[in-house]
Design a protein with these regions (language model features):
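Helical cap/lid subdomain of alpha/beta-hydrolase-fold lipid enzymes
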Residues: 115-251
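N-terminal signal peptide c-region/cleavage motif recognized by signal peptidases
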Residues: 28-30
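Generic preference for hydrophobic/aromatic residues in regular secondary structure cores
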Residues: 7, 11-12, 93, 155-158, ...
Length: 251
């Protein structure tokens, strides 16, 4: 049987070296801390909506950037350039990978940016309730007085028509998993949607050509990013590139 080498049996110079090695191990950050995760909230929300998810990712040893951007003040093209570049600049310079976890419109910002740009060390992307094919809610309410005031120019770009931004960005050219919600707490908006939905986006319209994986969970659009199962699936996808379909999720 091989026994562990005890430092007290080492010569004095080696003892000092052993102590330094052990101290280095104790002070070294966990391996996953070298991976950065940028969080992008949805339309008319703030970074506070992603706080629960941010805390869970930090507990999983990721470097987390929970970035706030003025979601109702500019177009998707302008917001994408601003948010992605500012977010990546806040990652640890030593990060081996840069992941994204987005809610709703935040996913469209990532698609818009990667349509025209590349990101060094890009890892995986998880989108929560993204209107990847637009939302019928925008189609039917865009002309209603006050809609643009509340949702801004970017909100008007999220319809389902051929003119909408999501429908002009093409297939995913990056590794992405999509989580859709199938419950609604907004029954009025759900009446405007033709299929299973989360109160803002149909399950079908969250799908994106070229995506790596897709799951539907019984969660609502406004609060899915706080749901424990959603959070577990986010972390699982970041680590494995797929969602967990059967059995309990590892803790």
């Amino acid at each position: 049987m091989v026994k562990a080498l005890s430092a007290r049996f080492l010569p004095s110079p080696l003892r000092a070296g052993w102590a330094f090695f052990c101290l280095t191990l104790l002070l070294s950050p966990p391996a996953l801390a070298a991976e950065c995760v940028i969080l992008l909230h949805g339309l008319a929300r703030t970074e506070a909506s992603m706080n629960t998810l941010a805390e869970a990712l930090e507990a999983a040893d990721y470097w987390v950037v929970n970035y706030h951007y003025p979601s109702t003040s500019q177009t998707i093209e302008e917001l994408a350039q601003q948010a992605i570049e500012a977010g990546t600049a806040q990652c640890d310079p030593g990060s081996d990978k840069v992941h994204f976890v987005t809610h709703s419109k935040g996913g469209i910002l990532v698609r818009q940016y990667l349509h025209d740009n590349t990101i060094d060390k890009l890892g995986r992307v998880v989108m929560l309730g993204p209107p990847n094919q637009g939302s019928e809610v925008v189609d039917k309410l865009a002309a209603v007085p006050g809609f643009e005031l509340i949702n801004g120019p970017a909100g008007l770009q999220l319809g389902t028509g051929q003119w909408s931004v999501p429908n002009n960005l093409g297939p995913a050219n990056f590794e992405v998993g999509v989580i859709a919600g199938s419950r609604s707490i907004n029954l009025i908006l759900s009446t405007l949607l033709p299929d299973r939905d989360d109160g803002k986006v149909t399950v079908e319209n969250t799908r994106l050509e070229g995506m790596r994986d897709h799951i539907t969970l019984p969660v609502t659009h406004p609060f899915m990013m706080r749901n424990p199962t959603v959070i577990e699936q986010v972390i699982y996808f970041l680590r494995h590139g797929t969602f967990r379909k059967t059995g309990p999720l590892p803790r």
